[in-house]
Amino acid sequence: MVDTNKLRGVIAENGKTQADVAEMIGVTQKTFYMRMSKGVFGSDEIQVMIDNLHIQNPMDIFFAKKVT
């Protein structure tokens, strides 16, 4: 499960928008927003975001465990 708040923070820190990241990973904005709401991305998409957003600790963002 993706920690979407941390991902949004990294996107903003890099001066990007969610629309920019959608284009970066090759999906429509609608698809990106849907994946953000579900907290699920494919491994290829995750790798592109790690590389392009210079994410230092991807485990904290992309493999976050939600406690309920």
Q: Where do the protein language model's features map onto the residues?
A:
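A short, Lys/Arg-rich alpha-helix, primarily the initiator
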Residues: 1-16, 20
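Key DNA-contacting residues within the recognition helix of helix-turn-helix
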Residues: 8, 33-34, 62
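Alpha-helical residues within the helix-turn-helix
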Residues: 12, 23, 51
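The DNA-contacting recognition helix of HTH DNA-binding domains
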Residues: 18, 29-30, 57
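Recognition helix of helix-turn-helix/homeodomain-like DNA-binding domains
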Residues: 26-40
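Short, basic-rich loop-to-helix N-cap that marks the start of a DNA-contacting helix
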Residues: 38-51
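Short C-terminal boundary/hinge segments that cap the last helix of small helical domains
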Residues: 54-68
